[in-house]
């Protein structure tokens, strides 16, 4: 398996250690799909973009999950340890003794728990990180989806996953909350990819935005959020952060001003529709 993964990294021109970490994460998620615990989690985050798009989207070191129930560190530790002992024919071995759980505080108005642990594929070591949030609403409902494996010939993973609409809604919420302090350039890159894909239903997106903002207690902006305005794109720090993000991840991307302009044009009417939904719900 290690040799096959190394060949894949070379063929893609990717860093082997990053791909190994990705493989370790993928196979731990596969063990989750074999466990009764699968009903307690929904997959979200950057891994979904590799499901939705044919070409690799952007490098990611972790998996993001929505967990149901209380944000209890000991319960999460027990859950992850139980996954480590599930056998699968993929070469991965996980070390339950290396597991660490810590509270994470996101930049925006919500947090969660982070689980990190080590694993081995043959003699190669990898690091696995799961970031688990709690309490969010998923609109429309999560659907069970097959996640194709990195390597052919090994079992695929079936898990419930976020819809595109809630992915957009949560990133927009962070954009509103953080305003000019937003350093999450990956969100702009992800949103632009979803905009260009053109598969998001406008009515569902408006409903997801209204529901997400209500659940997180974030007031819907009366106009465009600062993160979608000229003030944001002309800020020298933001432009530098965008350039650094694109360069570090070796991405092909438009300039920040073009990305923000296109996102503003796309999201402005949807935000207006979300405001009408929110007003009708709470007159």
Regions found by a protein language model. Name each.
Residues 1-41, 51-59, 63, 67-283:
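Structured mid-to-C-terminal alpha-helical surface segments
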Residues 48:
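Helix-turn-helix
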